[in-house]
Amino acid sequence: VHLTAEEKSLVSGLWGKVNVDEVGGEALGRLLIVYPWTQRFFDSFGDLSTPDAVMSNAKVKAHGKKVLNSFSDGLKNLDNLKGTFAKLSELHCDKLHVDPENFKLLGNVLVCVLAHHFGKEFTPQVQAAYQKVVAGVANALAHKYH
């Protein structure tokens, strides 16, 4: 992903304020609610029958935190996203058989959640930078599929 120095600054500046536990769970929860077919990858998570059940599910929150911690690793390695996510790409492709389109969906949901949490601070410039990053991460996660 090619980001300008200003875009990198915008991304890292906002990311330093992100509560990974809260935002991760909310992003994954919203993915599972807005795109319910993604729930099939989370059969072991228990009750996902209603939006309230999804958003209060401890396993959704825990996995969302794990996802965002991996995303944080990506932010530290923007010049080598494919390398950073190589093992996760392999896992999601070969073992879990996740449709790579879901990575794009989750990235877009994450952008929505960040906008919700940061309001006016999430300017169009910040959004544009984050859209580049989530697209790059989704592409890196889909790399094993190519």
Curated annotation (Swiss-Prot):
State the Pfam families in the record: Globin
- Modified residues annotated as Phosphoserine in this record: S44
Under the heading InterPro entries, the entry gives:
Globin (IPR000971), Globin-like_sf (IPR009050), Globin/Proto (IPR012292), Hemoglobin_b (IPR002337), Hemoglobin_oxygen_transport (IPR050056)
User: For the modification N-acetylvaline, which residues carry it?
Assistant: V1
* Entry superkingdom: Eukaryota
Q: Which Gene Ontology molecular-function terms are recorded?
A: haptoglobin binding; heme binding; hemoglobin alpha binding; metal ion binding; organic acid binding; oxygen binding; oxygen carrier activity; peroxidase activity
Residue runs in coiled coils: none
| One BP term from GO | hydrogen peroxide catabolic process
S-nitrosocysteine (modified residue): where? C93
What positions does the domain Globin occupy?
2-146
Q: What keywords were assigned to this record?
A: Acetylation, Heme, Iron, Metal-binding, Oxygen transport, Phosphoprotein, S-nitrosylation, Transport
Which tissues carry this protein?
Red blood cells.
One GO cellular-component annotation of the UniProt record comes to:
blood microparticle
Q: Which residues carry this modification: N6-acetyllysine?
A: K59, K82, K144
Residues involved in heme b binding: H63, H92
Described by its record, this protein's role is as follows:
Involved in oxygen transport from the lung to the various peripheral tissues.
PANTHER family, per database record: HEMOGLOBIN FAMILY MEMBER, HEMOGLOBIN SUBUNIT BETA
> Assembly state and interactors?
Heterotetramer of two alpha chains and two beta chains.
What's the family? Belongs to the globin family.
What name appears for this protein in its UniProt entry? Hemoglobin subunit beta
Q: Can you name the source organism?
A: Chrysocyon brachyurus (Maned wolf)
